[in-house]
Each structure stands twice: as C-alpha cells, then as structure tokens.
C-alpha cells in the first residue's frame, strides 16, 4: 500500500514538473511573438532611416500621430543619460486585432543615436533608472548598428512614456566620436499598421467597393463578417466579402460608386517621428570655462572693492 502511494506521489510530481515546463515554453513563445514585430523592418531595411530623413516604419503605419522626445541638452563622455519617448494614448479607443476582435493598442519605438552612443548596460544604471526600465526589453536594430535601439510591441496603457538608457561615448577611447553637437532621431507608433512589408494590406483598413451599382443584399456570414452583393448597371452581380470586426456604412438599396468605402476606418493608431539635438561636452573645456568664470568673478569683486577703497580715500581727503 505504501509502495503504491509512493508511486502515485512520484507520478504526480512528474506531471506537475511537466506542466510547469510546458507553461514556461508557452510564455517564452509568446514573448518571442510579442517582440517579433520590429523584425519586419529589421529584415527588410538595413537602416531604418532613409536618406530623406523618413523612418521606414511610416511605410506600414500610414496615419500620422504626434510623439514627443526629451533628452538632456548636454552630456559628458562615458556617462549614462535618459532619452524619454512620449506616446499620447487614448484609453477609450480599441484597435482591431488580426482575428477581428477588439483590443488595447500596443506601442513601439525606434531610437536612432549618433555613432558611438549605445544602450547602457544594466551595471551602469542607478536604481532610479533600473526602476524606470523594469520589464522593458530593448534590442539593437542589428549587430552592426548598436546605435539604433528598438522596442515593442508593448502595452500602450502602461507605456505612454518609454525611457531609453543611453551610454555616451568617450572620444578619447573611441576615435570615431568627437565633442560635437549631434541629433537623435526617434520614431514611435501606437496600434497596428495598415500594410505589411510585402505590400499586403492588413485588416486595419476600410474596405472600398469593388464596383459601381446598387447594394442588392447584405448577408451576415457565420464567421461574423458580411457578404455584400452589388448589382451593376449591366445587371451583373458582384459579391464582395467584408471581414469580421469592420462596421458597414451601407444599407440595402443604396447606390455606391467604385472605390467608395463601404465600411468605417478601423484604424485608431498611427506613427510619428521627431528629433532632438544633444551636445557631447568636453570636460576639459567645461572645467576651463568654470575657471574662467571664477576668475572673471574674482576680478570683478576686486574691482568693486578697489573702487570702494578709492572712494573712501577720496572722502577722507575732502574732510581735511
């Protein structure tokens, strides 16, 4: 009896371990899926910023949205600083997902740094910065371009501000960098795109009519979409499929033109880009400026004291 109970307990432990292992695999798989979206650009474009200055994410996210960037005006070499990307988020809006259901908007961003600047390692971050970047997983755009950092998609509700920890280069070590003024370019999106890199449209688009004519019939499909039957002026019947999740703007008997939208626009997201300037400051120049300012201040102070002393002597001479 005891032997049977021991076997059963061992079997239960093995089953429990297998369940935990399976759960871990699923979590890792989902994590890989959630981080796979930036790979669209990474696989298609060697550099995400075109020669015109346009960031390639705009090729898939057609709607424009405002984004904002914050960074210090000056940084010292070999120091860690924050670059904050702000993505305005509307909590009352839902996006259409790939399966036609509605869900929260996700966000993503790419930061294009000057050559030599790169993602700061965790051992260089202070506690405050570690807390801000907790649960954020940044990736280099490619092995060659470690000055370009991508993140996303991540939940928009919790990430309206994304803090990028950046390590400034030291020109004394990296001879390709200099004490100059540089530009940081940022692109960020919220919600799904309208196109895939292949040029194929996603379901995040309004549906145009395939023909001119009269709406003969609207049939709901079992999957939740619609079949719209259009009768042309030549008495030809054309059937058009509207996928699940889209809202029709037409009704039976209505006349429409070819190319006229028969659904509302489901897109509630978009893409925006911005830039900011930053100076890599020379510490020697900064120290020299401080000493110069102090010397000027001391000189002015001595001048004032000397002037007061002179006025005092003049006053004494007049009394005699």
Swiss-Prot record:
Question: Which is one GO molecular function term here?
Answer: iron ion binding
Q: Which residues of the sequence carry a binding annotation for heme?
A: 37, 57, 60-61
Co-factor: note: Binds 1 heme group covalently.
Q: Which domain of life is it from?
A: Eukaryota
What parts of the sequence cross the membrane? 286-305
- Decide whether keyword Transport is in the record: yes
Q: Entry's PROSITE patterns? A: CYTF (PS51010)
This protein's cofactor list reads:
heme
Q: Which SUPFAM superfamilies match?
A: Cytochrome f subunit of the cytochrome b6f complex, transmembrane anchor, Cytochrome f, large domain, Rudiment single hybrid motif
Q: Which GO terms describe its cellular component?
A: chloroplast thylakoid membrane
UniProt keyword list: Chloroplast, Electron transport, Heme, Iron, Membrane, Metal-binding, Photosynthesis, Plastid, Signal, Thylakoid, Transmembrane, Transmembrane helix, Transport
Q: Which Pfam families match?
A: Apocytochr_F_C, Apocytochr_F_N
The biological process GO terms on file are:
photosynthesis
Give the main location.
plastid
> According to Swiss-Prot or TrEMBL, what is its membrane topology?
Single-pass membrane protein
Q: Which InterPro entries match?
A: Cyt-f_TM, Cyt_f, Cyt_f_lg_dom, Cyt_f_lg_dom_sf, Rudment_hybrid_motif
What is the stated purpose of this protein?
A: Component of the cytochrome b6-f complex, which mediates electron transfer between photosystem II (PSII) and photosystem I (PSI), cyclic electron flow around PSI, and state transitions.
Output the PANTHER family linked to this UniProt entry: CYTOCHROME F (PTHR33288:SF10), PTHR33288
Name recorded for this polypeptide: Cytochrome f
């Amino acid at each position: 009896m005891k032997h049977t109970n021991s076997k059963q307990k061992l079997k239960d432990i093995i089953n429990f371990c297998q369940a935990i292992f399976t759960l871990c695999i699923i979590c890792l798989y989902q994590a890989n899926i959630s981080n796979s979206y930036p790979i669209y650009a990474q696989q298609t474009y060697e550099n995400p910023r075109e020669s015109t200055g346009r960031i390639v994410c705009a090729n898939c996210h057609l709607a424009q949205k405002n984004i904002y960037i914050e960074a210090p005006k000056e940084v010292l070499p070999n120091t860690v600083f924050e670059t904050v990307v702000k993505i305005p988020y509307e909590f009352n809006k839902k996006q259409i997902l790939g399966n036609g259901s509605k869900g929260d908007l996700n966000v993503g961003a790419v930061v294009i740094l000057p050559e030599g600047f790169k993602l700061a390692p965790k051992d260089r971050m202070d506690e405050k910065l570690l807390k801000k970047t907790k649960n954020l997983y940044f990736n280099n755009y490619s092995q060659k371009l470690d000055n370009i950092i991508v993140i996303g998609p991540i939940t928009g509700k919790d990430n309206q501000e994304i803090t990028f920890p950046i390590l400034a280069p030291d020109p004394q070590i990296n001879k390709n960098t200099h004490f100059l003024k540089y530009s940081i370019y940022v692109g960020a999106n919220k919600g799904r795109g309208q196109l895939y890199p292949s040029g194929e449209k996603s379901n995040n688009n309004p549906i145009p009519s395939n023909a001119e004519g009269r709406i003969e019939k609207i049939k709901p499909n079992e999957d939740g979409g619609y079949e719209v039957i259009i009768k042309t002026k030549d008495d030809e019947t054309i059937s058009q499929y509207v996928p699940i999740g889209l809202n029709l703007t037409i009704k039976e008997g209505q006349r429409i033109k070819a190319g006229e939208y028969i659904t509302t626009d489901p897109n509630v997201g978009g893409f925006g880009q911005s830039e900011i300037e930053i100076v890599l400051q020379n510490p020697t120049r900064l120290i020299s400026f401080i000493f110069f300012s102090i010397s000027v201040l001391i000189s002015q102070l001595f001048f004032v004291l000397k002037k007061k002393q002179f006025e005092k002597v003049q006053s004494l001479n007049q009394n005699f």
